[in-house]
Amino acid sequence: MTATGKREWTPDQLAAIRARRANILVAAAAGAGKTAVLVERIIQRLTDPEDPVSLENLLVVTFTEAAAAEMRQRIGAALEAAVARDPENEALRRQLLLLNRAHISTIHSFCLWVLRTYFYRLDLDPGFRVMDPAEVDLMQLEVMDRVLEEAFAAEPDGGPVTDLADSLGGRGDANLVDLVLRVWEFSRSLPWPEAWLEQVTSSYKVTPETPLESLPWYGELRQMITLELQEAAWYLEQARQAAAAPGGPAVYLDNLENEKEQVTRLLEEVGDLPWEELNAKLAAVHFGRLKAARGEDVDPVLKERAGKLRNQARDLLYALKEDLCRDEAAVRAELERSGELVATLVGLVRRFDAALREAKGRRNLIDFSDLEHLCLRVLLDEGAGPGRLQPSDVALELRQRFAEVLVDEYQDINTVQDAILALVSRQDVAENNLFMVGDVKQSIYRFRLANPDLFLAKYRQYPEGEGGPNRRILLKANFRSRQGVVDGVNFIFRQVFSPLVGELEYDAAAALVGRAGYPENPAAATPAVEVYLQEGKVAAGTGAGGRTDLPEAVGAGKGGKISGGAGYGETLSGYGAASPGGETGAPDLEDLTALEREALLVARRIRRMVRGTPERPGPEFQVWDQEKKEYRDLTYRDIVILLRATRDRAPVFLEALKQYGIPAYADLGSGYFAATEIETILSLLRVIDNPHQDIPLAAVLRSPIVGLSAGDLARIRLAAPGEDFFTAVVKAAGAPLLPFTARESAAPSSTATGSGGALDNQPGQDPVCIAPYIEDTQEPWRDDHPGPGAAAGKAVPGKDRDLASLLREFLARLERWRTLARRQPLGDVIWQLYRETGYLEFVGGLPGGAQRQANLRALLDRARQFEGFARHGLFRFLRFIERLQQNEGDLGTARALGENEDVVRVMSIHRAKGLEFPVVIVAGLGKGFNLRDLSGDFLLHGRLGLVPLYLDAAAGIKYPTLPYLATGHRLRLEALSEELRILYVALTRAREKLILAGTVRDLPRQAENWCASLFLPGEQLPPVLTSRAGNPLDWLLPALARHPDAAAIRDLAGVGGGHLLPDPSSWQVEVVRGGELPDRGSEEPGVQVRVTAGYQGTESAGQQENPGLLCSGWPGGSRELAGAVTPVQETAGKTVAPPGSNIAEAGVEPGVSPPAGAVSPQDETGPTWLQQEVARRLAWTYPRQPLTALPVKLTVTDLKRRFDVFNEGETPLRPGENTFTRRPAFLQSHQGLTAAERGTATHLVLQHVDLSRPVTGESLAGLLQEMVEREILTPEQAAAVDIRAIVTFFAAPLGKRLLARWEQVKRELPFSLAVPAVELYPGLPAEAAAGEIILVQGIIDCLVEEEDGFLLLDFKTGRIPPDPLAAYREQVRFYTRAVETIFNRNVKEVHLYFLDGGVDFKVTS
């Protein structure tokens, strides 16, 4: 369907709709209308006048339940329309009646139907229940605990399992548990998991006669070596071309040609050589020393380019040699050790699988994995096995029943699911009936064990022509995106996709063909694609306090402007007024992370698009409304921000959007357990389960449920310093010991009761309050346990209750709640807690209240679901939650926002799959790929098996074996292919405008790397380069650099020529360099901004947001908290209390009420309580105030100044003392280089001196010239270097020691050392400074490793002080301490060498 709503089937779509009697694979590109084609095919099958089928004879398999519901709805709508056109057609009416019984479902729902129908074939109890995922996790962890406990018990003196656990390391057995579960889960994605486990084990049973070259991993190792050699050859060829160019360093040519010949020859032989010969030839690769390229005719740019490329090739090959260097005997020894580890691991997996099956069978439970495997058992004949899919009589029966099997999103199925579909579809030539739709470029669920190779195999095998048993049909037309978006997407992916990275060619068959047909509109978005590149570091001294215009920008693409940053982001904290005129103050750019600045950039761009600028208010452009069939102004709901992952990044964008007054929403699917309201209720449940848990108990007491202050908790702690906190609470309450209290009985003490006691509430102290408004059904406490006010003869009614009575009330309720937990179902207990405390209503009044309430209701729902588990109870529920958190699990936040609200959505790319938006912003493109799975102790691959590092816990050895390197190479290529497909999904969500944003460090250097693509022939980027990508920008920018509109990137790299690719796409490219925070501009006062998320921050509800609201001293508490909370209105950013409330009258903040006996505000005989409270708070001082003035870090030079006794008039720095005494540079008259600048230049030369050959005046002169050419030194700095002094040093005995051991010399070695603060500032109070450290940083000029220790040299270029050893002793002491700490070797000598006088001072300890 086009944008205008006209349904005009393309020839390819018609072919997919009408093709019959063949297995058909429809490769549908993004926006190709595959769902519409699938629905139309079904309708035409149902209404075919010659061969109609019934809905009950179709099997339609979708990827999600939502997709199945949509498919059912579309089919129903089409049938209703057909009935409306032909109301007398009984067959159509019957199909409508059959719709709800039709097999339109996910693969799991179909498997469940098979098991419910044919349960007797498996001796399966028909009353089985499918476990909730939470139950599955809990059962797996419980079973794993039991399996490991038995395994360790069988090895009291150690054994294979203990060895494996020790080799994996980590705290406890968490790493081993995770590994066993991961291997088990992976095996269950295969049709015959036991056969795969056996294959994995047997692959390590290698005899001495087995050639290494025959093992499955060796082919991958060869490919890895080949790619490395190809990359090195490419670098060398580029270096050779630079050297051979006019003005190039021609003297490099001999070396470059020789080195390239070595690599080329090895490339030709790598496929045929056995390992021993290949290893020897790799070890023989050698790079010699380049000749010096001098003279005015040598272009420094070409010289630097040639040298840099050659060094890249050298470093790459030397690293390869180091990784692979081992003989065949060593390889076989590694295989033997790996085999031992794998056999032990597989044994644990088998034991776990058997124990889990037994546990599930005992309770008549199955999980989703069981659904697939049990269904497969029903459908397989007894003689079936790996590679032999022989259908059972049930499978043959279903083949006859289903006239056609239609599969949506075929690229996302796994091997087990594919086997099930093959068994229920017809396989004979005349009656093939499997119809598969998908797009392998959108296969992004490998982490869920989807196998895109299944789609690719059929894609390559099936022909496009008609007549055969199998057929491939391509749907290339894109009905979603404007032509500009389509052209931009094609331009990028045509260059990047390859069989190596992406796993297919992006050729004419894969490219998009624009067919959206948007009507012309001058106000539509143009250009369709924008790119914003931001530098990750900010220049020192920049900030928001200066200019308010945009950061400096360098260049722009066609139609673009040279401008700087824009804004990003949004927030989580519910409602808040936009800051008029930036009242809250603009943050300093140096205080913002790169992600925060990128989020601000995105937010500012959104605000401009929707609201315009002061000069041009209103939306920047219009979008097409598909429902109204007309153009309309852009709104927030038209915009989505897509991120690779949202868990830690979406909150940053939410906050930035809030700063710009932009409503936004993010359904993160995580952060549930971090939500304050969930933490509070879980803490309460933990206390109910076991009150002797200090942290949960303190959390509950401090929470709004009780509302104690930090001072109250401290006073409680003092009541029983040596006991647990609950015992302290009991003693502080002066309460009798309840049945669940600990160890001993204690009568009320003077510290807990009586006037003037430590726990009394005195005027001026933090107000103590408990939730006095919760339902009070308890008997009053006995008179023999009076509160602290009783000793003074004062009553303790209502709001004037003291701490002890509040604690007694809490303890009484806690005992009742514990009794309730033993008698009632868990869900009822939680609901009773909500009802009694009023906490559910309370959080509803906080910012983000709807989300908070949704989270609490979700906890209640999950507790009730948990009750379905046979072994239920509060303890097990809490244990399940804890284990889930330990394994980094999350239940996902509850959804609290409708889809049609006018907000910007922030979501992950995975969640956006299948959706489309008028404006798509893909952000975070500079974020590195997450390849953590490639660096674990064990690698896991379907074909290559289980591959461990070489692990020897006893010897403390861990390193990669050859199979590990080969498997890691294969997994890396597969992971990169997945990331490329994810990027394709992101870019193809856009209908009318696509915006790309990313941040990288050292932008000019990165641009130079990206622009290397300009010197490559052909259109497709070499796979050896795309396989080296570290983030999406490493694909996007090398491709985009070749576009005529990308001048900004080429200018940044300093590249003027190269190979540009003419293309119809139009791009706007803006580069943001350093700079300042973009101006947020003036916001209209009173704007209320809602920004919510399926995530809550860690602020303490009711403390930071509305302190003590539950504890407010308002009279007349109701039975539930909700009735006692007075609503607070927000108007134009100001908080306004309701008329007549005591907040408005007394000016007291909510939740702060006078303690018992305080003077009322109307009492004029003395200071009011409020005045006392204000005075107390103003008089408070921070107990560790001296530490606030300490520096976080010091340099060794700073320390030298502190201890320099020869600087008359100076005194050691004191904390907080101002050290800025130099005049600003712009006020200084320029009198040539300063002594410090001359010293810096000299140190740079000493750092670059070639120590492998004699140091002469001539060699140093050549070095200085080269450093000037490379812009390391300016000519003025080079002229200031004293060559003669350096030559003198190297001619002296000390210099000769450096030259003699030049390979062991380390120069300009930076270090950081943590030093106790009291060591540097002895005058600090001991208590205040306890545990405080200061980071000392420095750079060691020269360190020489000799046989018996280190020789440390510190070069000096200034004057020689009267006593140099005393002047620099503290400085070299820290140098020595750092070296000995870092290298764990002694420093035997320290020398100060003054170059100006050629004087050597040996420093003694």
From Swiss-Prot:
Where is the segment annotated Disordered? 778-797, 1132-1165
Q: What task does this protein carry out?
A: The heterodimer acts as both an ATP-dependent DNA helicase and an ATP-dependent, dual-direction single-stranded exonuclease. Recognizes the chi site generating a DNA molecule suitable for the initiation of homologous recombination. The AddA nuclease domain is required for chi fragment generation; this subunit has the helicase and 3' -> 5' nuclease activities.
Q: Which domain of life is it from?
A: Bacteria
The UniProt keywords, alphabetically, are: ATP-binding, DNA damage, DNA repair, DNA-binding, Exonuclease, Helicase, Hydrolase, Isomerase, Nuclease, Nucleotide-binding
UniProt keyword Nucleus present: no
Catalytic activity of the protein: Couples ATP hydrolysis with the unwinding of duplex DNA by translocating in the 3'-5' direction; ATP + H2O = ADP + phosphate + H(+)
One Pfam family, please name it. UvrD-helicase
Q: Cite the UvrD-like helicase ATP-binding domain residue spans from the record.
A: 7-482
Q: Which residues form the UvrD-like helicase C-terminal domain?
A: 551-914
Ligand binding (ATP): 28-35
Enzyme Commission numbers on file: 3.1.-.-, 5.6.2.4
Q: PANTHER family, from UniProt?
A: ATP-DEPENDENT HELICASE_NUCLEASE SUBUNIT A, UVRD / RECB / PCRA DNA HELICASE FAMILY MEMBER
Similarity-based family: Belongs to the helicase family. AddA subfamily.
Annotated GO MF terms: 3'-5' DNA helicase activity; 3'-5' exonuclease activity; ATP binding; ATP hydrolysis activity; double-stranded DNA binding
Q: What protein name does the entry list? A: ATP-dependent helicase/nuclease subunit A
Q: Which InterPro entries match?
A: AddA, DNA_helicase_UvrD-like_C, DNA_helicase_UvrD/REP, P-loop_NTPase, PDDEXK-like_dom_sf, PDDEXK_AddAB-type, Restrct_endonuc-II-like, UvrD-like_ATP-bd
Biological process per Gene Ontology, one example term = double-strand break repair via homologous recombination
Membrane-spanning ranges: none
Composition bias, Low complexity: 787-796
Q: What gene name is given for the protein in this entry?
A: addA
Q: How does it assemble?
A: Heterodimer of AddA and AddB/RexB.
